[in-house]
Amino acid sequence: MRIAVIGAMEEEVRILRDKLEQAETETVAGCEFTKGQLAGHEVILLKSGIGKVNAAMSTTILLERYKPEKVINTGSAGGFHHSLNVGDVVISTEVRHHDVDVTAFNYEYGQVPGMPPGFKADEALVALAEKCMQAEENIQVVKGMIATGDSFMSDPNRVAAIRDKFENLYAVEMEAAAVAQVCHQYEVPFVIIRALSDIAGKESNVSFDQFLDQAALHSTNFIVKVLEELK
């Protein structure tokens, strides 16, 4: 099976890249694509760059050029739910934009005109990801909504405003909704799997720098387990 794995930053893709066999890397429009073999699958690992425009552009190139059967977006995120701690893992049930507001024209907050309010992750991939983490004892794994915007959420006032908009939000980051929207339009199944590097609004910038490598390791180990179980 041909599986695409997307991470925004070098820290988020480096460990998985080192695990690929017969790896070949090429750069297209500033985006790094590495093809290789892992767990019996052909894996295309994309380093997309940070933010929604980079994520949308690179995911479009990915789907047009490499035609993966499934897409997994991984990396770090900021925790939003009160039950979460740094290092925990969130599996997306749906993904929304948290910085889109066209409510003046009767759209839901976060809804892009012409698109659904949220982008539903593939149920089979969500179930498989959840199954892969059942044996984990030291990492809390939850599933729920992930929201995306082109801002790092370190301002407590902005965090509070987004919490008011999305009651059941578990994590925020800067690429997933763009990846999900492109996958939705191409009808390619996707899931977002993010490990928490910080808790939004609580000295997030300090925590992010300190725990990014830990989050990257957790998310990469999780991705490998999913690939090993994926049939």
From Swiss-Prot:
Residue numbers annotated as active site: E12, D198
Top-rank taxon, per record: Bacteria
Family matches, as CDD domains: MTAN
Pathway(s) where this gene product acts: Amino-acid biosynthesis; L-methionine biosynthesis via salvage pathway; S-methyl-5-thio-alpha-D-ribose 1-phosphate from S-methyl-5'-thioadenosine (hydrolase route): step 1/2
Enzyme Commission number, as recorded: 3.2.2.9
Role played: Catalyzes the irreversible cleavage of the glycosidic bond in both 5'-methylthioadenosine (MTA) and S-adenosylhomocysteine (SAH/AdoHcy) to adenine and the corresponding thioribose, 5'-methylthioribose and S-ribosylhomocysteine, respectively. Also cleaves 5'-deoxyadenosine, a toxic by-product of radical S-adenosylmethionine (SAM) enzymes, into 5-deoxyribose and adenine.
Entries under PANTHER family matching the protein: 5'-METHYLTHIOADENOSINE/S-ADENOSYLHOMOCYSTEINE NUCLEOSIDASE (PTHR46832), 5'-METHYLTHIOADENOSINE_S-ADENOSYLHOMOCYSTEINE NUCLEOSIDASE (PTHR46832:SF1)
Protein name: 5'-methylthioadenosine/S-adenosylhomocysteine nucleosidase
Originating organism: Bacillus anthracis
Classification of source organism: Bacteria, Bacillati, Bacillota, Bacilli, Bacillales
Gene name, Swiss-Prot/TrEMBL: mtnN
